[in-house]
């Protein structure tokens, strides 16, 4: 983005010594158009670099709000510093602009691979190395911001060399080209680059376009401003940058496989980008347990998923009617598997945002075997939608609602743990209906857990909190790799709720369970009077309270 630059006062001599307009290979109007086109392209590339850092940092480090704040604030600050620093380059605006664009193309184009590499190979070292991705994120934000900020004073000089105009008009033209370019870059990143190329290849292509645009503008329009040696030096620098970016593009698939193995181990079997999230499956063959990762977070582990899903589903299914069941999330089909063990279930609606996860749960032999081919059962109906939006528009009533969603500390899921969300759930509960919520680990994140419980109560439901221990797998990848090992979750927390107050029990006529018994369930009930912190407030859409 452009930082304002104060132009020379009206009537002041031009900085190149008061000479007449320099020689140009085209008419002044055409040359001015080319400069503004360069501003447009560079602005688009600059915004792609910003968005790429925010997106990758949110995936690797977590908490998208914090990462966006860090990247944008550091980058805008650095842009101001870069604009001031570029004053010294104004007498050599063409050479300076060419060098800055080459550096920006290299730094911005390589930023995603460098950040991913540091995360993959040092993220689990612990100690000072655990903060490596965060430090590198700040460093890239600072470097890219400095280079972007240095562009505009130089572009102002170049456009004034072509044809002198009043300061306000020059600034307006530059800002217009910059903001339109930023719009194009901002829309191209989520709708073209990410779906078609992914983060790594997308930003490499952006760096290539950046280098070509900057080099072509200087060498094509202002080559007479450079010495012969300067022209050749700029050509060599740009060729080196383009060669490095091209080499990275050729090796990006091998790099991504190696980095993925460093994060997930060497047993990666499926890795795909669905448009909603990255989905990785490991194991599931030759007796090895299956693990499902969503955006780097371990979502399902074959080691202990049975304990989790039995504790999630069966207490809610054991007390009252359960002919109609709504599963929010749970695209892996494992919650539906447990629901379908009750013969009198007439319909199961699964509301899942990511159709790719459902497709994988249907087709992958290991995952479909683990969920007992739940999606082949005619009683199961899948709705691809955001759970919040679906609840706002549905008028159906359900005997049981199962909230099998990502942990509440993940920013993208915060609205699905809000008072407004549970108010919508309460509206679709049939008389005597029950809600069960996966509320995150109790031992390692007690405040987040009790905030969920307080939020459900604030929606007008009576709650019974409980937990299940014996969790064998803690955080293994993604943002959670940097979590202190002492806080790795070893339990799951749940909240059972209804309008009248549910009973935490297992019915006598229920299916035979492998891990959950009446005695263990009774022992795992939590006493709110003793365990609940005294000052926990409910979370709302406008005031989320799940940050630790």
Curated annotation (Swiss-Prot):
CDD domains: AdoMet_MTases
GO cellular component: plasma membrane
GO molecular function, one term: thermospermine synthase activity
Superkingdom of the organism of origin: Bacteria
Stretches for region Spermidine synthase: 230-488
Main subcellular location: membrane
Keyword field contains Membrane: yes
Catalytic activity: S-adenosyl 3-(methylsulfanyl)propylamine + putrescine = S-methyl-5'-thioadenosine + spermidine + H(+)
Gene3D superfamilies assigned to the protein according to its UniProt record, in alphabetical order: Vaccinia Virus protein VP39
Region annotated Disordered, chain positions: 524-548
Enzyme's top EC category: transferase
Disulfide-bond pairs as recorded: none
InterPro entries: MFS_trans_sf, PABS, PABS_CS, SAM-dependent_MTases_sf, Spermi_synthase
Membrane association type: Multi-pass membrane protein
EC number: 2.5.1.16
Oligomer status and interactors: Homodimer or homotetramer.
Name the UniProt record assigns to this protein: Polyamine aminopropyltransferase
Protein's organism: Streptomyces avermitilis (strain ATCC 31267 / DSM 46492 / JCM 5070 / NBRC 14893 / NCIMB 12804 / NRRL 8165 / MA-4680)
